[in-house]
From Swiss-Prot:
Keywords: Aminoacyl-tRNA synthetase, ATP-binding, Cytoplasm, Ligase, Nucleotide-binding, Protein biosynthesis. It catalyses: tRNA(His) + L-histidine + ATP = L-histidyl-tRNA(His) + AMP + diphosphate + H(+). One of its GO terms (cellular component) is cytoplasm. The keyword rRNA processing does not apply. Its EC number is 6.1.1.21. One of its GO terms (biological process) is histidyl-tRNA aminoacylation. One of its GO terms (molecular function) is ATP binding. This is Histidine--tRNA ligase. The lineage of its organism: Bacteria, Pseudomonadati, Campylobacterota, Epsilonproteobacteria, Campylobacterales. It is found in: Cytoplasm.
Amino acid sequence: MINALKGMKDLLDKDAYYYEKVIKICEEVAKNYGFTFINTPHLELCTLFKRSVGESSDIVGKEMYEFIDKGENHVCMRPEGTAGVVRAYIEKKLDKNTSVKRWFYYGSMFRYERPQKGRLREFHQFGVESLGIPNVYEDASIILMLVEIFSRLGIDFKLQLNSLGCSQCLPKYRDRLVEFLDSKEGFCEDCLRRKNLNPIRVLDCKNEHCQNLLENAPLLINNLCTSCQKDFETLQQILKDNGVKFELDSKLVRGLDYYSKTAFEFISDEIGAKAAIAGGGRYDRLIEYLGGKSGYGIGFAMGIERIITILEQKEEKIQREGIYLCAMDEIYIQKLLHIATNLRKEYKVLLSYEARKLAKHLENADKNNTEIFLCMGENEAQNESLFYKNLAKKEEKMIKISDLKKVL
């Protein structure tokens, strides 16, 4: 038997139901905020992610699915969505006049990491990217969009905020941080590698010993320039005005190298202590990193598998939907196929091609979680009728075929 690869799984049944539910809500909210759909390729040149995600990131250092294709191109499966969207923005020359684009996307991402609860090697994300807007009000809107999504999904969260500064204040802080790191000994190999490539990423280390060494490290939030400080204070005030609670986390730097200024994470304790379920921030330098004209960008990505895990733990009762259409004798199936074809213009219809007893059909309809049960037997056929049962409300009656749409 051939099985799915480790860390990759089929999406079906209850998982598929929750996936569709999450995407539907995310899409509705994103459209209400003025975002439109974009779809980028699963396969990209490795250079795209080495420039954007950064050489110091675990993704580039350890986790990318990369290979040389038959055309001698060094390619990889996309490990995240932002870089591909920004690449599309530049490729379509939208950066030349700083066009404003608000896009949302969803689909598979790929990272070769240790599979665990809520973390797979092929996983799904929903994300948004807003390009061409420098204003901190857009940062607030992006965060408020996520707040609305989680509110509709019924998911509790903690919001953590930080500012990573800009090209004015970040270099000075980086020098101070490196000086501090050089004064300490005992950092892990990852931290030593990050110190040389992007020292701020050292703050993101999860090693307890390294965190102890970082206890008195200088904080970027205390080293912001006047402009960054003003924007960060404005962002906090907007969130307060909208009733959004948050915590300041001076060591929140996100896992990718392209972030600047606003950085945020949404945390849930429902799938483990401080598990991130969404995160993002501003990346004004990324467009230029990828060869475009200097511009502005902010976005977020949400891990759909983790959201599904939370929803399943809540044991939400899956709502019945659709129509189950069946016959007690095979001679009626052709007639029912004609009825089903007409109904499918407006309704979801599952037609059984097998002639069974009423009890067996009802059992099958229940397994398929359908709401309306319609069956034709000899008596119904003679009277141009159907046996009707609402499986959610437990109502049943005989109805004329001519009245079917009126009843539905």
